[in-house]
Amino acid sequence: MPGKSSLEWHRHYRDRREELEDFWGRRASAPNLRARYRVFGASVSMASNHECAAAAFELSHPQFSQVPGNADDLPGYELQFAVDPGRETTDVPDDLSTHMRRFGGGDWLLIDAGIWGSAHIDLRARTAHFILSPALARRPDLISSCMNTVILNLFIGSAGAGMLHASCLLKEGGERMLLMMAPHNTGKSTTALRLVQAGYRLLTDSMVFVRETSAGTQLLGFPVGRIKLRADVRREVVAANAAIEEWLEPEEVRSETKHSLDLRRYRPECVQSEAVLVPPCVDLCLLERTGKLETTLRPALAQTVMEAVVANSLYCDRDEVWLPNLELLSRLVEGADCFHLAAGTDVASLVGVIEGMGERP
């Protein structure tokens, strides 16, 4: 009878399934470790066949602003890691990021780390699949910095959060916020460190995410409390305070070795770890370095600021992602007091000019 035959084949398949050739490596890559995290309040599910994924997440997770409670109304993300034991390679170089290539088409992205691994991302499904060599599995720090955090930031933007490439600092009990935008290597991080030393709290020195919540416009940072200094600035900072040198760690950034200062470890009281709502007073500065002694300030048009946002914060992506995000950023800019800040070399002048912005009516 047809029904009986069907049942026999089902039984035969179940009995022989584990003997079938693992042509696609599904059996070898099947996860046996699972964990769940919260990133900006959204759920992130992690599955892996190797403990390196959990180790990488322990490095990635604290770099995102904490959000009180759970944002279960936000879409969740899934990341699956598979270490291929047959893909043994040479050791992974510390400057792995300079060896990586990125490709994109539609909702699919690929991060290619050559012989050491790759990550395939489906933005619409909010999933990422990592294939790693054992050598890369031994470097959870590089998995975190070159893959994990990059992909999580992509998902956050695709979920509707606008992003500014800016430093964000707070003062006066959080009632005053300073945002500083500048191209790479033009003094933004140096200025941020000087303001931290003058009593400001740092949310982030790199990426400020903006999203609307029922309580108001929320700002979140990545990486939280971390400042990256050029080699010449490092020498200047260490000359002024030798004790800071032990807290500086070399890090490859855009084919350049910078020195990262994690304020969460060095001076945790100077870090704004939790996400914040936009306060009543927001100063947004387009920063430039002049080499002169004195710092000067002049008003900036919101249109000029938005042009800088497009130039410094965006990369080629789909219009359906960027246009709503830019609308969010535009509302933030229009509600801020905008300036051109020409940062001088005299610290007292710099701090004095910035403090003066908060004394206006």
Which residues does each PLM region occupy?
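A noncatalytic interaction/capping subdomain that flanks phosphate/NTP-handling catalytic cores
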Residues: 1-184, 193, 197-201, 208-361
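Conserved lysine of the Walker
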Residues: 188
